[in-house]
Each structure stands twice: as C-alpha cells, then as structure tokens.
Amino acid sequence: MLRMPRTRGFGVQSPTAYSFLRKVVNEKGFLRIYCQTHAGISSYPQDAPRQKRLLFRIRTVYPNVVELSASSLLKREDFQQFLWNVSDDMVLVVTDINLDAEYKKVWLRLVADNCTVLTFDLVDCGIVFFDKTKFKQNFNVNY
C-alpha cells in the first residue's frame, strides 16, 4: 500500500498504455514545459481542479477528445448512437463514473463494449481509446 502512489504505471505491460500513464496522466513537469513554450499566454489552468488539468494535458497530446458526463450516456439509444459515431483517433473522457450506481453501470457497459479498446478508470473519471490496432485492455489507475 505504501508503494501505490509511486508506481506511476509500472506493471502496465502495454507500451501504449504505459506511455499514456507516464507522459499524460502522471506528468508533473507539464506546467513548466508549457510555460516555457507559451510564455505570453496564461491559459494553463494552474488553480483548476486536478481533473481539469488532466483534461488539458490529454487535449494537448490528443487532438480529438470528447468530454461527456456519465449521465449523458444513461439512455441506451444515446449510448448506442454515440458508439456508432466514434472514430479510431477519438479519445473519450467520461466524468462522474463513480458518483452513482447507475453511472457506474454506464461505465462498466462502456468498458465491456466491443467498440472500446483501451479504458482507464481513474476513480473520478474514465478515459476510453477507440484505436482498433490495439488489444482490448482495462486499467484501474490510482490517480
């Protein structure tokens, strides 16, 4: 248990998942690098909540990001309609996945769906990749 905050992706065998965890999720030097390259622009959310800072880092690395609340996928027809319109380069960030039992079911249904490939459960949000060139994997991350 003492080692959990220091693992930072070790134990993840997929190179894609490991790279995502190390370079996006657990990146601590991102603010310094961003400030050096964008000295005159102060759009990095320094005082924003942790989830917003994570979303900023994801959007910087992956251009096609969709952020949805789990409540927007509660209806089965909305859920299926969304999955029919995804592309391989899309990254989905689902917020509030553990807020309610129904939202948890939506997340588990999304993880089990054949359209999703890589899923990361970060406790307060979930991240889904749809790239069909990768193998289907699910990761629970202590973030």
Can you say where each PLM-predicted feature lies in the sequence?
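A short alpha-helical cap/connector motif
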Residues: 1-91, 98-143
